[in-house]
Amino acid sequence: RGSSDPLLAVKEYLKEEPYTAEEIEKILEEKLPSIVNNDPTSLAVLNAATHFKLHQRAAHVYSEARRVHGFKDTVNSNLSDEEKLKKLGDLMNESHYSCSVLYECSCPELEELVQVCKENGALGARLTGAGWGGCAVALVKEFDVTQFIPAVKEKYYKKRVEKGVVKKEDMELYLF
C-alpha cells in the first residue's frame, strides 16, 4: 500500500463516486469553510456544490502532468518527425478527452470544433485556455494547413457567421 505513482494513488485512495462536503470534512477532520479561510468566492462555490468528483479531478491533473512530460520527452526524442507528430497528436487527443470527461471543462461548441479539426486533417486537437468556452489548438502538418483552414471555416465557422455569432471580417482572429 502506498504507491509513489500519483495515478495509482488516486485509484487506491479516492472512490470514483462523488464525495459530499460532509464526507470530505469527516476525512479531513476539518470544516471546508475553514480550509478555504472563509473566502467569499470559495464559500459561494461550496454552497452551490452538492458533490465533489475528487477521483476524476485528481486523475485529470496527474494524467495531464504525465502528458506534459511525455510531450517534452517526445519533442526531445530521436523519433522520426512523422513518429513525433503522431505521438504528439495522440497526447493532445488524450488531453482533450481528459479535460472533457474527467475535468468537465469543455462545452458543446469546443467538442464540435475539436471534432471538426480531427476530421479535417489535425493529428491532434484539444481545448486550451481556461475551458468552459475557451479556444482549441490543433496540430496540423504544414503541408495540410492550406486545406485544413478552409475546411474548418466551412464546417464549423460558416454557420456561426450566418447566425451572427462570429463576424466574417474577424475570422482571422479565430482561425490561424
Regions found by a protein language model. Give the residues of each.
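C-terminal nucleotide
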Residues: 1-124, 138-176
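Conserved phosphate/anionic-ligand binding catalytic regions in large, soluble enzymes, centered on
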Residues: 125-135
